[in-house]
């Protein structure tokens, strides 16, 4: 049995208030009896219908692997999933590097990063890009001065933390360089806002591998092309970030060990055993899940810590 619920954001976590048995209290022999369901959070940034369509196959496969019902919780924004994990009401989620850093800075004992997705060439990083409409007179990053910029989400690595931080390291203060900045409501929503003329430029994530016309091999641009929401000829990329660590799949640290082992066994074999489902959930072409740990994100955590200190 599998179900789907919706998280409307951090405040909407009240819908999860029905008791969810605490995994920490379960023994290895009875942990399944303690689970009403295994709850997977789905990050915002893509319209809910497409998110649920992409993850529908994984929902049933994880349920089969663990032997418990699985529920999907699509959130309106990154914060909804982060708060669900912190509250112990979600057991697993795929996060961006900045989202994990945000959770760690609030509670280092809440979740553990266990896997990340390799790119098709085996690399463990991706890029933020700034884009404009193809019919714009903005041809370079320098031309963006005095124009408006849409960030994706305040908890996004590629859609906020890294591009803003990298510009600041180059002496560019975004609030001074751009005429205005704002949040588009997610990666997909920001692209649409730029195409509709609400902002002059936006920021999103991509592998920068493969064919430009296809939206590269993986990332928000690829998902939008695949879903018929974007023609790459309608935008122009004018800036690329340094490499950003691929985001982790995290699990609650109090997840029973047997559940953790079964989950990791399924996920690490998913690309070979269920390639079509893997491609859907990966958002394009990717190299499979590979083990990762906290150390991979220490630089991101420090960058996020500095961002938090600078905002006080």
Short names for language-model regions:
Residues 1-11:
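Bacterial N-terminal signal peptides that target proteins for export
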Residues 10-19:
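Bacterial N-terminal signal peptides
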Residues 27-42, 46-57, 251-312:
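An extracytoplasmic/periplasmic, membrane-proximal ligand-sensing/linker region
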Residues 35, 40-65, 75, 98, ...:
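Bilobed "Venus flytrap"/periplasmic-binding protein-like clamshell domains
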Residues 43-44, 127-138, 239-257:
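A bilobed periplasmic-binding-protein/Venus flytrap-type ligand-binding module shared by bacterial periplasmic
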Residues 73-110, 211:
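Pocket-flanking alpha-helical
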Residues 110-123, 234-240:
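A structural signal for short loop-to-beta-strand junctions that line the ligand-binding cleft
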Residues 148-150, 154-256:
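Pocket-lining segment of extracytoplasmic ligand-binding domains
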